[in-house]
Structure formats: C-alpha cells, structure tokens
Amino acid sequence: MKQQKDASKPAHFFHQVIVIALVLFVSKIIESFMPIPMPGSVIGLVLLFVLLCTGAVKLGEVEKVGTTLTNNIGLLFVPAGISVVNSLGVISQAPFLIIGLIIVSTILLLICTGYVTQIIMKVTSRSKGDKVTKKIKIEEAQAHD
C-alpha cells in the first residue's frame, strides 16, 4: 500500500527538470542523425508524448515543471522576438513576399484544419450512431423476450 502512495506522489521539481532535460538531450541526439532538418524541441515533444502514452514517464514526473513553463510561455518567446528584430534587414528585402507567404500559409492551415475537423466529426458521429443502434437493438430484443 505504501508503494502505491509513493508511486502516485509527484516528483520533486529538480527531478522533473532532469527528466525534461534528458528528453531534450535525447531529442538533440536524434536530431543530429535525422536526414531531414527538424527542430530538436519538436522531436522532444513527440518523444515526451510517446513516453507519457507508454507509461515510461509518469505525468507526475513532469507536470509541475510543464505547468511552470506553460505559465511563463510569454517570457520564453522574448528571444524569438529579439531574433525577428535582428532579422529586420532580411525581412525588409522582400516584405510583400513574406506577407504573401504568411497569408497563403494561414489560409492553407485554416482549410486543412476544417477538413480534418469534418473528418473527425464524421468518424465520431458514426461510432456514436453505431453504439446507439446497438443499444436500441438490445432493448428491442429484451422487450420481445
């Protein structure tokens, strides 16, 4: 019984930082071997998701640090904003092209999101409809008995 309490207890903050740092370290190693360029942080997110889904990492082992990072996400975007300001010279060379790319990519993103949402809604409504149909058939069979 005591082991169950210890297993469900959230890990200490430092332990959680180490777990996330190890995931990021492994993702950086994977990034160096990948044939296509992909940011290590994206690989790390996918890796952490897989580890959480498989149970290799428990939610309590990363939850507090994850929540802290999410709560301070605005502060984490400051370096990205500064790098954009430093790149203004590059942006000023082709501003209409960049604005056009932003508009086109936003429209494509909205279209793809709409289609995926429609597909998911159709699939979930079918599965719900199948469950309702089965339940009605069972109730009818019980009523005839």
Curated annotation (Swiss-Prot):
Cellular compartment(s): Cell membrane
A single Gene Ontology CC term: plasma membrane
Main location: membrane
Pfam families: LrgA
Membrane topology category: Multi-pass membrane protein
Record keywords: Cell membrane, Cytolysis, Membrane, Transmembrane, Transmembrane helix
Transmembrane segments: 13-30, 40-62, 69-91, 95-117
Annotated GO biological process: cytolysis; killing of cells of another organism; programmed cell death
Keyword Transcription included in the entry's annotation: no
Transmembrane keyword on record: yes
Membership in a protein family: Belongs to the CidA/LrgA family. LrgA subfamily.
Function: Inhibits the expression or activity of extracellular murein hydrolases by interacting, possibly with LrgB, with the holin-like proteins CidA and/or CidB. The LrgAB and CidAB proteins may affect the proton motive force of the membrane. May be involved in programmed cell death (PCD), possibly triggering PCD in response to antibiotics and environmental stresses.
PANTHER family reported for this sequence: ANTIHOLIN-LIKE PROTEIN LRGA, HOLIN-LIKE PROTEIN CIDA-RELATED
Protein's name in the database: Antiholin-like protein LrgA
Organism from which the protein derives: Staphylococcus aureus (strain MW2)
Source taxonomy: Bacteria, Bacillati, Bacillota, Bacilli, Bacillales
